[in-house]
Amino acid sequence: MCRFFATAPKGLNELLREELTTFGAENIKTQPTGATFDGDLEVGYRSCLWSRLANRIYLVLLETELPNQEALSSVVQSIDWSKHIDKEGTFAVSFSGQGLGITHSHYGALKIKDGIVDYFREHYQVRPSIDTEVPDIRVHGHLNRNQLTLSLDLSGYSLHQRGYREGIQVEAPLKENVAAAILMRANWPEIAQQGGAFYDPMCGSGTFLVEAALMASDTAPGVAKSGEMLLNYWLGHDESLWQKLVEEAEQREQVGLKHLPNIYGSDISHKSLDVARNSIQAAGYDDVIEIKQMAVEQGRKWGDWSPGLIVCNPPYGERLGEEETVKQIYLKLGEYLKAEFIHWKAAILTCHTELGMFLGIKAKRSHDFFNGAMSCRLFRFEIEEEWFRQPALQPKQDLAEQVLQLQPDLADTDNAKMVSNRIRKNMKGLKSWVKQNDISAYRVYDADIPEYALAIDLYDTLESGLWVVVAEYAPPKTVNPTKAKRRLYEAMSVLPSVFNVSPERIVFKVRSQQKGQDQYERLDEQKAFFTIVENQTRLRVNFTDYLDTGIFLDHRQVRQEVAKLAAGKRLLNLFCYTATATAEAVKAGCKSSLSLDMSKTYLYWAKHNFMCNDINEKQHVLQQENVLEWLETATQNPKDLFDVIFLDPPSFSTSKRMDGTLDIQRDHVDLIQKTLKLLSKDGKLIFSTNLRKFKLDKASFEPDYQIENITQRTMPKDYARNMKIHQAWLFSRQ
């Protein structure tokens, strides 16, 4: 078994993991710069031949910890280099990272080179030559503080260099492996297999076209340069295995070419098309890929095209004064797509997310990408009328995007500026508190100006940074609906600039009193989950699929209280929702736990919260139960008692799996009394409710229990403007 490291462009880690799995890789661990994985030599060879995403595949020779810089030479010399490098051959060394006083890559490479040379001089009295341009072998060293990794570069060149663009100068090219990743995200392999066509209406140098053909024909991207890879000069090379894999790849390509779907490209620039023709010819697809000079606004399909996939990378408009020109390009592209490509899929890459609005089609999904150092966004579309943006503003999740497109001047009005100033003032007041407490999700505005009745929450996610969730409190019937809408749009218009976030990451929701099943109503099917950190616990949130996000932010300190009490104890979490309180308690040292909820959806969500924190589900159990029925049974002859119980029931609930209803004001005495039967001798129960007019019947529990109102101490600073958001009590046996 060998250890390998695959480098890849930033942001492709998860796609790379999926790809490496298809090669037979095991123990894959992604990093910002790529992924380590285990496998036999065949897995490494397949990665060199078939990876469409990796830059380089390294065979790891040594991983060790260095006590000091001086130890580097002896560690390098401890490797039997005669198994890897011909003593009469040539080699080169590259180096990355820093540590132990090594801060320059050239110096690190020089130290490793000297160690290899000294090894050969000591054992063979001869040494291989250094050739930094075309060596037989490339050795790579990486130092992370005191952790040294020495590897062989199996290809010797970046695998994104397929060979079809060599010698071709392209302005601001999209790397081949980034283009391949975009095609993967857009599901091109599946579409091609079903016979769908491919079209790039702004094909430029033709990178998408060639990569689409390579994928659709099942061509290994490394096969054309298989003879140039440095693994051919490695002394540990298995020539027969390599030739077998190369022949297999060539056979697969021959079969794949027979089933290649139609691939088309067009561009307004004849110079770009000349470059594209050269690339297409070099790749061997000049009889397969059809290109044509044509502006988007002149666009018409020129043949019988089966519905398939459109992918393009429109101009970014980086130069001063180009913004309006680029906006017009997006408008025309959107008109072209809607007029000619109904029932197709599309994927558009842009580094200015607001430009996507001008296509006039709502994106179904989006993904972060990097074109070099430039942060970009890939928008994926289904070109169906139901996804076309309507000219009138609609109170939907993408309301901020709509306002930006249809009422771009609204943010300059006096009322909008007033809302902006209030939010900025709130943010300034919370800034030090957020930083001191390492808070990544919090409320920044809660109807501070009564006429602008919104709740605005910020979520700083690990995956993609800041998201803004805006909930509107449904206005009373006495309020003029037109005026209420106007105020809503004014508030939404300033949010992108206030939070310095693209409107696509501002999610709007309408709040109203929830009844019965409404509280669990699914709003969408995007299934886009993100991760935040609270009290050193990773928690999964979802901004689009439900009215709620998976975490109640006002309960932040309630969860902290539960976690503190449960350290080293047994915890019962009733109506656990997504079990955020349990996850935080386990991170704080909870010995064992049982978390119950009736919703399969939320328990599945809770399971992912547990997975994010490596929580043992045998020790910490998630169980789907009608909590009221479970309590009825569990309290008849209680055997399992708990040291800490967290009881946070809904204010009102009905369900298909539940007979009758739960009304917390009416039923709280019976519910709490049953729950207390499961409390150990010195146990504690925290009861919490969000019912604003709730009154606790303390007399029903005294004098057997000491009851402490902990509402004020569990109310976080970001909810100080709304002290009725929840109430909480701590029950202790007298």
Swiss-Prot record:
Major localization listed first in the record, in broad terms: cytoplasm
Q: In the Enzyme Commission scheme, what number(s) does this protein have?
A: 2.1.1.173, 2.1.1.264
Give all residue intervals belonging to the THUMP domain. Answer: 43-154
Iron-sulfur as a keyword? no
Q: Catalyzes what? A: guanosine(2445) in 23S rRNA + S-adenosyl-L-methionine = N(2)-methylguanosine(2445) in 23S rRNA + S-adenosyl-L-homocysteine + H(+); guanosine(2069) in 23S rRNA + S-adenosyl-L-methionine = N(2)-methylguanosine(2069) in 23S rRNA + S-adenosyl-L-homocysteine + H(+)
Give the matching NCBIfam families: PRK11783.1 (NF008748)
Q: What is this protein identified as?
A: Ribosomal RNA large subunit methyltransferase K/L
Biological source species: Hydrogenovibrio crunogenus (strain DSM 25203 / XCL-2) (Thiomicrospira crunogena)
